[in-house]
């Protein structure tokens, strides 16, 4: 995740990566935004999909085998891709539409049986195709980034195995990148209006 997160243009800066397990995660990449965000662009969401799929892509590239380790990332990927297509109007084929998400607050087990479809089978098929296209293209992009930066990837892995935690500065050194510019964190005086 770290390599892809650092090499995509619309992702939050990577602050550190660790291989120390926490909870059900075998490690994690910590990304923090430079500022509070209220809107997310399509480019940012596409980068997020790519980053989420980077772990699975790395398994395939390095080991020629995939594991169950990416299951949470795959669930998140599907949720983001579906939201992009169905709720945010970010589908090329469907255009700027938002469809009902079907969450009407019913909590009993058979709720899916009682729902009435609000769109046709043809539209449902197009939605599925668009979601799969987003996921497949993001996966291919993640594989391409990792493959084209394999030497840096291997160096990052080697460093992580030796140190277990690597911070942003060292990540940038390994990748041969300039550090992400941090905004001035000092408080700015409020502008005063004339009274």
Language model features with spans:
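Soluble catalytic regions of large protease machineries
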Residues: 2-195
